[in-house]
């Protein structure tokens, strides 16, 4: 029903910071240092390092990459989205259990005053994080092939190696409980050390106005974090923060059930996709 990946918070432009030349080099170093800290073992250390310098983003982006104003805006939205998500994930208090599956997959939720209700999927996957990153980022447009909750994902624009704007169309829900929805999202994909981050938020793009017969939903904050398991580097601790406004007159009880179940379903579909990929590789090697 929903794009099975990652989208996220509200970006802030900070236009007044763009021309502060002296901050550009320091901003770039600081942001990269903060994200490297996220790959460390202690989740509580994420926040103190990530919150501080969001106001320095635009000057380093424009100077170092040479992007135009629209591209800078997309990159900033993705960067801010990542910071907002990590802040939410770093706060371990106040989470309520929604689902605990038989295999240990867990969905938690929390209500935030500036965001609304957010959901957090926590699973352990028998895959290396590098392989998962390739599937979810490198093969993003193939998601509709293996996830029935997603009809289509299309990349509208790429900005550098870490930012893209996408259009996603949701798949049908059982009984058509929730009608067709689509999303235009900016996505930020980063790898720092052995940890992978996939974040995003709703945005607008001139090539994809609202479509007739489809409700344009909004998402954010959303982020996937993939870290090797401390017990086995061939397994991945997979966390997915999800926040979506489906729009329309849908009872909250239905929305909550649909969103939490969507996360559980996504984990199962992803496992099956990766298992199928492994079989295909083994068959190719045997030929």
Swiss-Prot record:
<keyword id="KW-0809">Transit peptide</keyword>
<comment type="pathway">
    <text>Steroid metabolism; cholesterol metabolism.</text>
</comment>
<comment type="function">
    <text>Plays a key role in steroid hormone synthesis by enhancing the metabolism of cholesterol into pregnenolone. Mediates the transfer of cholesterol from the outer mitochondrial membrane to the inner mitochondrial membrane where it is cleaved to pregnenolone.</text>
</comment>
<dbReference type="GO" id="GO:0050810">
    <property type="term" value="P:regulation of steroid biosynthetic process"/>
</dbReference>
<dbReference type="Pfam" id="PF01852">
    <property type="entry name" value="START"/>
</dbReference>
<dbReference type="GO" id="GO:0032367">
    <property type="term" value="P:intracellular cholesterol transport"/>
</dbReference>
<comment type="subunit">
    <text>May interact with TSPO.</text>
</comment>
<keyword id="KW-0445">Lipid transport</keyword>
<keyword id="KW-0446">Lipid-binding</keyword>
<dbReference type="InterPro" id="IPR002913">
    <property type="entry name" value="START_lipid-bd_dom"/>
</dbReference>
<dbReference type="GO" id="GO:0120020">
    <property type="term" value="F:cholesterol transfer activity"/>
</dbReference>
<keyword id="KW-0755">Steroidogenesis</keyword>
<dbReference type="InterPro" id="IPR029866">
    <property type="entry name" value="StAR"/>
</dbReference>
<protein>
    <recommendedName>
        <fullName>Steroidogenic acute regulatory protein, mitochondrial</fullName>
    </recommendedName>
</protein>
<feature type="transit peptide" description="Mitochondrion">
    <location>
        <begin position="1"/>
        <end position="61"/>
    </location>
</feature>
<feature type="domain" description="START">
    <location>
        <begin position="66"/>
        <end position="279"/>
    </location>
</feature>
<dbReference type="GO" id="GO:0006694">
    <property type="term" value="P:steroid biosynthetic process"/>
</dbReference>
<dbReference type="GO" id="GO:0005739">
    <property type="term" value="C:mitochondrion"/>
</dbReference>
<dbReference type="GO" id="GO:0008203">
    <property type="term" value="P:cholesterol metabolic process"/>
</dbReference>
<dbReference type="InterPro" id="IPR000799">
    <property type="entry name" value="StAR-like"/>
</dbReference>
<keyword id="KW-0496">Mitochondrion</keyword>
<dbReference type="InterPro" id="IPR023393">
    <property type="entry name" value="START-like_dom_sf"/>
</dbReference>
<dbReference type="GO" id="GO:0015485">
    <property type="term" value="F:cholesterol binding"/>
</dbReference>
<keyword id="KW-0813">Transport</keyword>
């Amino acid at each position: 029903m929903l794009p099975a990946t990652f989208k996220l918070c509200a970006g802030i432009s900070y236009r007044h910071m763009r021309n502060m030349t002296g901050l550009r080099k320091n901003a770039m170093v600081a942001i990269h240092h903060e994200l490297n800290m996220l790959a460390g073992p202690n989740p509580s250390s994420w926040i103190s390092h990530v919150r501080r310098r969001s106001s320095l983003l635009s000057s380093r982006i424009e100077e170092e990459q040479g992007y135009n104003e629209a591209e800078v805006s997309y990159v900033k939205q993705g960067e801010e989205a990542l910071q907002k998500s990590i802040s939410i994930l770093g706060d371990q208090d106040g989470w309520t259990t929604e689902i605990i599956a038989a295999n240990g997959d867990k969905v938690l939720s929390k209500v935030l005053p500036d965001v609304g209700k957010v959901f957090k999927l926590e699973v352990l996957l028998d895959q290396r994080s590098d392989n998962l990153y390739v599937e979810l980022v490198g093969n993003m447009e193939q998601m509709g092939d293996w996830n029935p909750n997603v009809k289509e994902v299309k990349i509208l624009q790429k900005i550098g190696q870490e930012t893209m704007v996408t259009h996603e169309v949701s798949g049908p829900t059982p009984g058509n409980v929730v009608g067709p929805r689509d999303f235009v999202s900016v996505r930020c994909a980063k790898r720092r050390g052995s940890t992978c981050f996939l974040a995003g938020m709703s945005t607008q793009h001139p090539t994809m106005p609202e479509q007739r017969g489809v409700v344009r939903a909004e998402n954010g904050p959303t982020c996937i974090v993939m870290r090797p398991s401390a017990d086995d580097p061939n397994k991945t601790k997979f966390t997915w923060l999800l926040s979506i406004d489906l729009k329309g007159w849908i009872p909250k009880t239905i929305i909550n059930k649909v969103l939490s179940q969507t996360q559980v379903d996504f984990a199962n579909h992803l496992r099956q996709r990766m298992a199928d990929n492994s079989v295909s590789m083994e068959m190719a090697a045997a030929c």
